[in-house]
């Protein structure tokens, strides 16, 4: 069983939850990512929403792999190029862009219960391998596949975590850019 806890600053009604908008990034080591990907896509047996002392079975919830549809490509492609070629090319160049999973099949619940914390419990039809170490960083929210397609150098920036956005400037060594 994998249990993921969520906490909100505001009270939420269970009936307002829309988990279909959740996308997870598998952010562990390669082996753990591959095992989680396999188990979440193939061996997921049941999903439960836990709110306080109440348990809601979510029978239609599953995971959908991200990165295979044309609109999910991370590189520009012409519309007449083969989708299979694009997927292979991107997988070999940027395998992490295929480490995303969407929750699908969540139906609104008819409950007036409100909460600021809830959990999702994922049960599997077989146990995860004993050498798979699932830590907090294994399933991440708010991640996007980002690839720098800019063909020029930029000035260095200091990523100290003090800001959420950084201005990137072209290199002063090449003023023609």
Per-region residue spans from a language model:
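Short, low-complexity Pro/Thr/Gly
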Residues: 5, 11-177
């Amino acid at each position: 069983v994998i249990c993921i806890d969520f906490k909100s600053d505001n009270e939420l009604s269970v009936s307002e939850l829309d988990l279909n908008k959740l996308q997870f990034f598998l952010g562990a080591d390669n082996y753990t990512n591959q095992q989680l990907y396999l188990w979440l896509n193939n061996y997921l047996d049941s999903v439960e929403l836990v709110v306080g002392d109440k348990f809601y079975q979510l029978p239609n919830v599953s995971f959908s792999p991200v990165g295979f549809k044309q609109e999910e490509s991370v590189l520009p492609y012409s519309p007449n190029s083969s989708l299979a070629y694009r997927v292979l090319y991107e997988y070999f160049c940027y395998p992490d862009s295929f480490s995303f999973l969407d929750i699908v099949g969540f139906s609104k619940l008819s409950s007036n219960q409100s909460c600021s914390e809830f959990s999702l419990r994922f049960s599997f039809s077989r146990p995860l391998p004993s050498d798979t170490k699932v830590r907090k960083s294994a399933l991440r929210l708010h991640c996007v596949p980002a690839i720098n397609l800019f063909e020029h150098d930029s000035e260095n920036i200091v990523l100290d975590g003090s800001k959420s956005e950084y201005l990137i400037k072209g290199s002063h060594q090449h003023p023609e850019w």
